[in-house]
């Protein structure tokens, strides 16, 4: 006898993302299907076979990445245990075997322990971190390709937030707010500072793929960074 999926999803509520199971939609109101950020990622890193996803939330993008032809493995890191439970629940329903979910506080975790990858997919995370430069400094050693979608600080709103870096402090909702970071505040760097920081961290090529300074939630940018393989 098949379980009542509506009731099973309700046990893990609230949900952010919507998932289609056997032709029916469950979960939240937002569908990741057709998200242009995923398509831009694969245009940027078309040969990525192994992918590290940073900040996977409920796994909606993880499953789309994993189902892409040619992708053999996606390791998705997420800070909230409830989100991991949700992602693994949906993973079992969708029977996706090449995705793996692990809990990690990306404000402080040493990512080297997770190994090396062809590409890093970092969408919707960077602007939730109090010290994003600490994460960025680790990334060149993990993969030659880095894809970022993030909000950034407009220059008019910026001040010095760390040595040599300009940005603004953004209030977060805390651990109980599912779309917030884990700390009370986050740092939004200016776009110029973010791109310069990527170069200083070891990427030989940093490309502004798309800039949306009028985004409803604050200026946002899609960035691709590459380093030469050793």
PLM regions with names:
Residues 29-48, 64:
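Conserved alpha-helix/loop element of class I SAM-dependent methyltransferases that forms part
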Residues 48-57:
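Conserved class I S-adenosyl-L-methionine
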Residues 58-70:
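Conserved SAM-binding loop of SAM-dependent methyltransferases across substrates and taxa
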Residues 87-88:
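Conserved SAM-binding loop
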Residues 108-114:
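Short conserved loop adjoining the S-adenosyl-L-methionine
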Residues 121-122, 130-229:
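S-adenosyl-L-methionine-dependent methyltransferase catalytic module, highlighting the catalytic core
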């Amino acid at each position: 006898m098949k379980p009542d999926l509506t009731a099973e999803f309700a046990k893990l509520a609230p949900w952010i993302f919507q998932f289609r199971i056997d032709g029916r939609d469950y979960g939240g109101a937002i569908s990741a299907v057709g998200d242009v950020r995923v398509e831009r990622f694969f245009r940027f890193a078309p040969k990525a076979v192994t992918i590290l996803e940073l900040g996977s939330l409920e796994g909606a993008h993880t499953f789309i990445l994993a189902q892409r032809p040619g992708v053999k493995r996606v390791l998705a890191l997420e800070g909230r245990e409830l989100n991991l439970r949700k992602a693994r629940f949906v993973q079992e329903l969708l029977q996706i075997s090449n995705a793996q979910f692990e809990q990690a506080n990306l404000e402080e975790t040493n990512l080297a322990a997770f190994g090396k990858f062809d590409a890093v997919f970092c969408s919707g995370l960077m602007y939730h971190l109090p010290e994003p430069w600490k994460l960025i400094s680790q990334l060149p050693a993990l993969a030659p390709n880095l894809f970022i979608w993030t909000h950034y600080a407009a220059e008019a709103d910026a001040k010095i937030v760390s040595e040599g870096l300009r940005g603004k402090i953004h209030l977060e909702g805390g651990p109980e707010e599912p779309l917030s970071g884990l700390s009370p505040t986050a740092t939004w760097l200016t776009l110029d500072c973010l791109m310069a920081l990527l170069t200083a961290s070891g990427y030989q090529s940093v490309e502004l793929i798309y800039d949306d300074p009028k985004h409803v939630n604050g200026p946002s940018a899609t960035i691709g960074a590459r380093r030469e393989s050793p």
